[in-house]
């Protein structure tokens, strides 16, 4: 009798172990970048209390830029230079930004200054910049400077006719595009809707890059959303996408009686349209 029980247990363990190792769930990547960091202590503190996979984009001219860079570095958080760039509108940008008509030397000097402030940045994205990112000459000068410093470029896509990605490729600079703006609108329901859209985009395409800002409703949506992130979505820093790193496999499920897995989570997200409007 004991022999039969031991044999059954042994076979059951072998069976369940085989299923344990033969099945895994695919995951999609979600990268979230918070722009305009360095201005507001309270809101910045809330962002820095979030998982370190949330990347921060620091404006070099912001009063707390150096301090936020140091804090992000100490947390192991990915950092971007949030570079002010000329928009199509007449809105004035911060000091140290990039304007149409600048020479290569001027652009290089501005990038050097920004990197000396945001010292641990691994990349750059544009603050405004609807005119700048559509200008081939300015983008050529910028990508040349970024290539020398081994920085990647995240195009915030504030204008549809941006040439930043095209020029980056020509200059040997890794370039990525923003897919979702979380807070074109500051209304809680709208930000929540955009967060769901980012989840949907990641599932459909394998990865998604969402950009938001340190604002109360954005913070509230992220605090709730990140606590309940579906198991098929992996939150990653921007460096993960820049380096094309593989997702970390989720914990496998032990399938005891069926090879057909139960769902990992109840689907809380639906395909939704994106909000219209030009950000910033």
Swiss-Prot record:
Entries under InterPro entries matching the protein: Divergent_DAC (IPR006837), Glyco_hydro/deAcase_b/a-brl (IPR011330)
GO biological process: carbohydrate metabolic process
Keywords per UniProt: Signal
CDD domains in UniProt: CE4_DAC2
Keyword match Ligase: no
Gene3D superfamilies reported in the protein's UniProt record: Glycoside hydrolase/deacetylase
SUPFAM superfamilies to which the protein is assigned, alphabetical: Glycoside hydrolase/deacetylase
Matching PANTHER family: DIVERGENT POLYSACCHARIDE DEACETYLASE SUPERFAMILY, UNCHARACTERIZED YIBQ-RELATED
Name of the molecule in the record: Uncharacterized protein HI_0755
Keyword Cell membrane appears in the UniProt entry: no
Family: To E.coli YibQ.
Signal peptide: 1-26
């Amino acid at each position: 009798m004991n022999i039969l029980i031991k044999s059954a247990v042994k076979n059951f363990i072998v069976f369940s172990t085989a299923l344990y190792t033969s099945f895994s769930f695919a995951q999609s990547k979600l990268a979230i970048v918070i722009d305009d960091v360095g201005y507001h202590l309270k809101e910045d503190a809330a962002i820095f209390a979030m998982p370190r996979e949330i990347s921060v984009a620091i404006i070099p001219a912001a009063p707390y830029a150096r301090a936020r860079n140091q804090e992000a570095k100490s947390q192991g958080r990915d950092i971007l230079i949030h570079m002010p760039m000329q928009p199509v509108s007449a809105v004035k940008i911060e000091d140290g930004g990039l304007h149409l008509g600048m020479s290569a030397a001027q652009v290089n000097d501005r990038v050097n200054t920004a990197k000396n402030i945001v010292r641990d940045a691994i990349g750059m994205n544009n603050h405004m910049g609807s005119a700048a990112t559509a200008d081939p000459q300015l983008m050529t000068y910028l990508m040349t400077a970024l290539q020398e410093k081994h920085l990647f470029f995240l195009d915030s896509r504030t204008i549809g006719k941006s040439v930043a990605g095209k020029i980056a490729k020509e200059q040997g600079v890794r370039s990525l595009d923003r897919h979702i703006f979380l807070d074109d609108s500051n209304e809680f329901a709208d930000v929540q809707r955009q967060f769901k859209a980012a989840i949907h985009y990641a599932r459909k395409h394998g990865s998604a890059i969402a950009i938001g800002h340190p604002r109360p409703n954005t913070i509230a949506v992220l605090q709730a959303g990140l606590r309940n992130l579906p198991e098929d979505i992996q939150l990653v820093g921007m460096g993960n996408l820049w380096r094309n790193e593989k997702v970390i496999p989720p914990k496998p499920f032990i399938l005891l009686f069926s090879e057909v897995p139960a769902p990992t989570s109840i689907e809380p997200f639906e395909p939704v349209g994106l909000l219209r409007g030009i950000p910033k």
